[in-house]
Structure formats: structure tokens, C-alpha cells
Swiss-Prot record:
This is Probable potassium transport system protein Kup. Disulfide bonds: none annotated. It is a multi-pass membrane protein. Its main location: membrane. GO terms for molecular function: potassium ion transmembrane transporter activity; symporter activity. Transport of potassium into the cell. Likely operates as a K(+):H(+) symporter. GO terms for cellular component: plasma membrane. It comes from Pseudomonas syringae pv. syringae (strain B728a). The keyword Cell inner membrane applies. It catalyses: K(+)(in) + H(+)(in) = K(+)(out) + H(+)(out). It comes from the Bacteria. It holds the Pfam family K_trans_C.
Length: 631
């Protein structure tokens, strides 16, 4: 996801065709590689669907209308309009829905729950996508060479481990190839589809939705269940929204309707035509659709496409983690910028290694793309359902759509998403438990961190010395003042920071200027420089400064303070000292959280990145003071 920020920076100057190609390379990798396994999974996934004329046309009709309804209608017409100052993605949407429901605390809490659970499922998706995509590409080798079955997993692992190992170096150089490679991929998909359709043109009858309805009538027992496989054609739909901030709605929409949708539909119908003519080809209709001479080049192109799709979700996980950190739901981590030109190209080591471990376990544990498909559907449909719920709140409470218009539409959207999710629920017991368990663990971690930070602030505030009383005491008994500016980071605006009290106790001095600095993260992605800071003078050389950042802004505190042009405040590097407080949490029987959650929070706090690195403070101008807090 963050791969594209370089394009966003030059968005105004980029030609439409260049931006469209770039969008294809980043946004559509996941959904673009779905033809590798979707139709095969429908008939080979243990659903009990016979490979008959009516079943093939019925399944194709379901795929066709799913792409039209979910992607072309829901995402393109509605979800992409729910941008948070141009940014998309479930964390940005959650911030928007939280703002929309600000007057309704219970509803706001529900929006946070849906947003966090959708985000947690996205992390599961970020593990499943690389595993299932690369495995499905490698499985083409079974058709090209005999006896390679047992080499598929090792080769997939080599590719995937290599992909994660290069993340710290960035992908800016090879990233310029993503667009052209994926455009080539979609052109090949379309060409293969046309080739297949020419063999059995009657497959085009599946455009008629009656074939989809007929499928449910013929297969009453498995009609809904089969949607659990059909939804694989929609994997990656969430990326359309998540990457909107990098390219904008129009390039993403144009790429979908001009290139991606036609190529996908042609390929699915081409595979269907192939299976109509020869039911045995259902074992791998994607690769068997290609002429024999084209098989190896197609495997190579498929591998490149799946690597690009994997890179997109890995970068997306990095970007979403940054948003979650700044919104206060994940502990601070070391964030490395991998490009001096593109601000959004970042690397987060902890996330990278966690994803790599998850991917390796998935590949070794499931061994094939078909086995992984069960896990895939649960993550995809869960995230889609959470997105629809959040968008519904935005439509009704922020956009103020008339209920008579909005409610019937939203019911239809939620009904379809609910059917897809319900179809995947039974898969939880057939391999789909992984994304649910991973999502549950991540949800617990995020909510524990958020609640723990709230409780920590409350405990620190208890018995805090009010600032007016402290300043009044200084007027009565002035301490020795030294030259320079002391900046104390604090979450409260009305109490004296512990670091300031400790400094007074041990050093018996105050600086000429004392700044109580609070950093506030807004529910919007960016805050303009003109609105970055607020300044209030308390007298006696004391000032309150509040810095405002968006959830994708880089919180560079020294750079932000340099914009504060007040003659009485001097933030020059050699005259400014930063005082930080480092809390150590001691779990106790006090009210707040369960003891195990307090212990978990204490562990996360101990291992979180401190303010020094996160706020880009100069190492040689920082004094850190520790304090113990019972929770």
C-alpha cells in the first residue's frame, strides 16, 4: 500500500495513463491473481458440485454478478466516496465513523470494535495472501514437469522468505516495474480468456443472472456454501479502498472498468469454457487454458504477479500499523523509511518478521493453495462486512443521507456481505480458524493497549499537582533559573509533569523557559502546518504548547517546534533540552483491567519504542526520568 506514495506526491503532474498504470501495479495485484485458484476451488474444494453444464454456467454467473455488485457497485460507487481527507483503509474509515458517531458513545464504541476487528482480520489476510498466491503460482510447475509435487512447498518458501528479507532495503527501484508487469498480466488474462471463449462461446450465457438463481435451485443444500468459494474472486477488493490515498478515486475506478474487470471476466469465462469442453481440466483450469508452449512463461509471469500482490499487502500492513500507532491502538515501534523521495515507503521490522513467521507456518501447515482457500475466505468476508458497517454509519450520520434512500440500500449491501460471511463461517472448523484466532489475538492486543494507556494516564493524574498552584509557589519562592528552554512531554494540560517535579527535586533549578508539550493525534490523516500548534503563556516563563498531527503525519517534534515563531521562545537545538518520563507498570488488584491484561500491557509498554525515537528528538539533548505506576 505504501509503495504508491511516490505517485501520490507527483499526482498533480503525473499523466492520467501513468497514474492508471501505477494504480494497476499496486492496487489490483491481489484481486488480479484470484483466477489462479477461484474456479478450481469451487469444483475441487469439497463442496460436492458436479462438473456439469448447468453448474459451470451457474458458478460463472455467481462470479460475474459478485464482481459487479461488490466491486463495481459497492466499492466503486459508495465505499470509495467515504474518504478521510483523501485517505482510505479501514483505520481511516474507523476514524471517520468515530467522528460521525461522536454524540452517541455506545455507537462510537461499536464503530471502534468493528474497525479494530476488521483491521485485525486484515493482518491475517496479509499472511494468507502471500502464502496462497505464491503457492498457486508454483502449482503450475506440476503440469510442466512430472515429479515436482514435493518441491512446490520448498520453492514457495524460498520465494516468500526472499520477499520478506528484501523489505528492509525498500522496493523503490523494482517498484517501477510493478505497473508494467501487472498491465501485462491483465492483458494475458484477457487474451487467454478470449482464446477459451472461442472454443465454447455458449459460456457467455452465464451473464444472465438466471443461471446463478438456477444454481441455488438445483443445489439447495450447498447454494449458500458455494459462496464461500465464489468470494475468492473478490479477494483484494479492500485494497481498492485502502490505496485510495495514494492514487485517488478516479484512477482506481478507471483502471477497474477499462482493464481489470474486463480481463478478469474474460479469464473466468475462458476457464469456464475450457471446463465445459473438457471437465477433467477442472483440476487446474487456469494453467490448462494456456497452450503448451506458453505454460512456462505463464508460470513465470504468474510468479511475478503473485510477488507483486504479496508486496502490496505487506506494504499495506506497514501503512496500517503506522496509522494504528498514531491513533493509539498499537505500541510504538521502530519505523524505518526506505526511500528519501517517497515519505510513505516505510519498513517496520516487528511487523515484517511476524508476517514472515505466519506465512511460513501457513505454507508448511496447509501445503497447497486449495487447503488455504478456507482460511482466505473468512478473513476477506470479515473485513468486507466490517467496512460496510462503518460506511453505513458514515452515510447516515456524516453525509446525512435520507433514511428512505440509504436504509434499503444498506440493507442490500449488508445482506450480500452477510451471506458471503455466513458461507465462510463453517470453514472456521476446516482451516479458517487461523484468521479468526489471529484476529482475536490482535484485537485483544489493540484493545488492551488502548485501555492500558487510558488507565496509565488516570493513575499518573491521580494526586497530580495543579499547574496554577505550582506556578504560584514559584512566584513566592523563585528557584534558580538557568539559560535555555526545557520541553516536558505530558499528556495533561492542567497538571505538572512528573519529570518536571523530579527535575526540581534533584537539580533544584528551572530553565528560563519551561514548555509543557502535548502531542495530539487527530482523526484526520494530515494536519496543515498552519494548524500544527497552539501556544498559551502562563507567566513566570511557563508555556503550554499543543502539537497536532494527523494519523499519517510524521511526528517530528523539533521540526514542528521550529515553526513556532514567538520571540520569547527559543527552540534552537543547542538551547533546548527535552525531558521525558518513562513509566514502569506494576500490575495490582486495583480496579481497571483483569490482572492478565495488566501484565500484558506492562510487557507491551516495556518493549514499546520510547518517545525519543518516535518524535525524532536529538539524542544528546534528552533527559529521561523513570517512574513506577501501579495499575
Amino acid at each position: 500500500m505504501s509503495q504508491a506514495n511516490s505517485h501520490a506526491e507527483a499526482g498533480g503532474a503525473a499523466k492520467p495513463i501513468g497514474l492508471l498504470i501505477a494504480a494497476v501495479g499496486v492496487v489490483y495485484g491481489d484481486i488480479g491473481t484470484s483466477p489462479l485458484y477461484t474456479l478450481k476451488e469451487v469444483f475441487q474444494g469439497g463442496y460436492g458440485v458436479d462438473v456439469t453444464h448447468d453448474a459451470i454456467l451457474g458458478v460463472l454467473s455467481l462470479i460475474f454478478w459478485s464482481l459487479i455488485w461488490v466491486v463495481s457497485f459497492k466499492y466503486m460507487a459508495f465505499v470509495l466516496r467515504a474518504d478521510n481527507q483523501g485517505e482510505g483503509g479501514i483505520m481511516a474509515l474507523m476514524a471517520l465513523a468515530r467522528r460521525a458517531s461522536a454524540k452517541h458513545p455506545r455507537l462510537q464504541m461499536m464503530m471502534v470494535v468493528f474497525g479494530l476487528f476488521g483491521a485485525a482480520l486484515f493482518y491475517g489476510d496479509s499472511m494468507i495472501t502471500p502464502a496462497v498466491s505464491v503457492l498457486s503460482a508454483m502449482e503450475g510447475l506440476e503440469l510442466a514437469f512430472d515429479g515436482l509435487d514435493h518441491w512446490i512447498v520448498p520453492m514457495a518458501l524460498i520465494v516468500l522468505v526472499g520477499l520478506f528479507l528484501i523489505q528492509r532495503h525498500g522496493t523503490a527501484r523494482i517498484g517501477v516495474l510493478f505497473g508494467p508487469v501487472m498491465v501485462t498480466w491483465f492483458l494475458v488474462l484477457g487474451a487467454l480468456g478470449v482464446y477459451g471463449i472461442m472454443q465454447s462461446p455458449e459460456v457467455l450465457k452465464a451473464v444472465n443472472p438466471a443461471w446463478g438463481v438456477n444454481f441455488f435451485i438445483i443445489h439447495p443444500g450447498i447454494g449458500v456454501a458455494i459462496l464461500g468459494a465464489v468470494v475468492l474472486a473478490l479477494t483484494g477488493a479492500e485494497a481498492l479502498y485502502a490505496d485510495m490515498g495514494h492514487f485517488g478515486r478516479k484512477p482506481i475506478s478507471r483502471a477497474w472498468f477499462i482493464l481489470v474487470l474486463p480481463a478478469l471476466l474474460l479469464n473466468y469465462f475462458g476457464q469456464g469454457a475450457l471446463v465445459l469442453g473438457n471437465p477433467e481440466t477442472v483440476r487446474n483450469p487456469f494453467y490448462l487454458l494456456a497452450p503448451g508452449w506458453a505454460l512456462l512463461p505463464l508460470i513465470g509471469l504468474s510468479t511475478m504477479a503473485t510477488i507483486i500482490a504479496s508486496q502490496a499487502v505487506i506494504s499495506g500492513a506497514f501503512s496500517m500499523t503506522l496509522q494504528a500507532i498514531q491513533l493509539g491502538y498499537i505500541p510504538r515501534m521502530h519505523i524505518q523509511h526506505t526511500s528519501s523521495d517517497a515519505q510513505g515507503q516505510i519498513y517496520i521490522g516487528a511487523v515484517n518478521w511476524a508476517l514472515m513467521a505466519g506465512v511460513i507456518l501457513l505454507v508448511i501447515g496447509f501445503e497447497s493453495s486449495g487447503a488455504l482457500a478456507s482460511a482466505y475466505g473468512v478473513a476477506v468476508t470479515g473485513t468486507m462486512l466490517c467496512t460496510t458497517i462503518l460506511v453505513s454509519t458514515v452515510m447516515l450520520m456524516l453525509w446525512k443521507w435520507p433514511p428512505l434512500l440509504a436504509v434499503p440500500l444498506l440493507i442490500c449491501l449488508l445482506l450480500v456481505d452477510g451471506l458471503f460471511f455466513a458461507a465462510n463461517v463453517p470453514k472456521i472448523f476446516q482451516g479458517g480458524a487461523f484468521p479468526v484466532l489471529a484476529g482475536a489475538v490482535l484485537f485483544i492486543l489493540m484493545t488492551t493497549w488502548k485501555r492500558g494507556k487510558q488507565l496509565l494516564a488516570e493513575r499518573i493524574d491521580e494526586g497530580g499537582l495543579p499547574l496554577p498552584i505550582f506556578i504560584g509557589s514559584i512566584r513566592v519562592q523563585p528557584p534558580h533559573r538557568v539559560q535555555g528552554t526545557a520541553v516536558f512531554l505530558t499528556a495533561r494540560s492542567d497538571a505538572v509533569p512528573h519529570a518536571l517535579l523530579h527535575n526540581m527535586l534533584h537539580n533544584q533549578v528551572l530553565h528560563e523557559q519551561v514548555v509543557l508539550l502535548t502531542v495530539v493525534y487527530e482523526d484526520s490523516p494530515r494536519v496543515p502546518s498552519a494548524q500544527r500548534f497552539e501556544v498559551e503563556s502562563y507567566g513566570e516563563g511557563f508555556y503550554r504548547v499543543i502539537l497536532h498531527f494527523g494519523f499519517i503525519d510524521e511526528p517530528d517534534v523539533p521540526a514542528a517546534l521550529a515553526l513556532c515563531h514567538l520571540p520569547e521562545l527559543d527552540f534552537s537545538p543547542m538551547r533546548t533540552t527535552y525531558f521525558l518520563s518513562r513509566e514502569t507498570v506494576i500490575p495490582s488488584k486495583m480496579d481497571g483491567m483483569a490482572r492478565w491484561r495488566e501484565a500484558l500491557f506492562a510487557f507491551m509498554l516495556k518493549n514499546a519504542n520510547g518517545n525519543l525515537r518516535f518524535f525524532k528528538l536529538p539524542f544528546n539533548r534528552v533527559i529521561e526520568l523513570g517512574t513506577q505506576v501501579e495499575m
